[in-house]
């Protein structure tokens, strides 16, 4: 679908962004949250030593107020300590493990670990607060792919290493987009990348 391709392209372009990491993360979160149409979205930086968290970036849909009255030193919800993605739709609330999500008034939540660090992990939270919602496979897949790109951006910034790792992850995502994509050098016109669909 065209919207998905446009949103994917916008997110992929952030790989080449030289802007401050907070700005890149803000743009990334806005593109993702608007595309899957959630009420609010946050990236939390968990503090390992104090069991508190900071709100690194937050996005709110029009009319929504932040759930948090401060951005640092917030007690961590236990469901944020997840090693793998946690997807809770309205129809699975009430089952074991989702009580805490229900208690804070969320109707549906997706939690994705972004970065593991000794100082504390970075975690994404996407939330439906107003109405019941059942996450679709398309929403989950888009989020998963977007997270992989953000991980590439962060890894690149942290290590300032070669582009090889990022492009491997990017290549994998672009090979699964479902349409042909190629990238050329604006100055020389030389093709820099073509995904598998185009090569076939």
Question: Each predicted region: which residue ranges?
Answer:
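PAS/LOV and related PAS-like sensory modules
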Residues: 1-45, 145, 152, 163-189
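GAF sensory/regulatory domain recognition
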Residues: 30-33, 42-77, 83, 191-192, ...
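Short beta-strand-to-loop transition segments that serve as allosteric relay/switch motifs
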Residues: 61, 122-134
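Soluble sensory domains of the PAS superfamily and closely related sensory modules
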Residues: 77-86, 92-95
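Signal-transducing coupling segments at domain and membrane junctions
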Residues: 89-108, 128
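A short, aliphatic-rich beta-strand micro-motif
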Residues: 107-115
């Amino acid at each position: 679908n065209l919207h998905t391709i446009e949103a994917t392209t916008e997110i992929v372009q952030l790989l080449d962004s030289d802007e401050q990491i907070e700005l890149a993360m803000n743009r990334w979160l806005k593109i993702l949250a608007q595309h899957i149409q959630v009420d609010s979205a946050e990236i939390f930086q968990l503090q390992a030593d104090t069991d508190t968290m900071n709100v690194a970036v937050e996005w709110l849909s029009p009319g929504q107020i932040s759930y948090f009255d401060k951005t640092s030193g917030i007690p961590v919800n236990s469901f944020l300590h997840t090693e793998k993605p946690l997807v809770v739709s309205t129809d699975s609330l009430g089952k074991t493990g989702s009580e805490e999500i229900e208690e804070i008034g969320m109707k549906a939540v997706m939690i994705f670990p972004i970065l593991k660090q000794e100082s504390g992990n970075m975690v994404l939270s996407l939330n439906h607060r107003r109405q019941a919602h059942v996450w679709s496979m398309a929403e989950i897949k888009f989020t998963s792919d977007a997270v992989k790109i953000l991980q590439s951006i962060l890894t690149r910034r942290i290590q300032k290493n070669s582009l090889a790792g990022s492009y491997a992850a990017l290549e994998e995502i672009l090979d699964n987009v479902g349409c042909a994509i190629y990238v050329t050098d604006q100055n020389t016109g030389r093709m820099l990348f073509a995904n598998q669909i185009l090569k076939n």
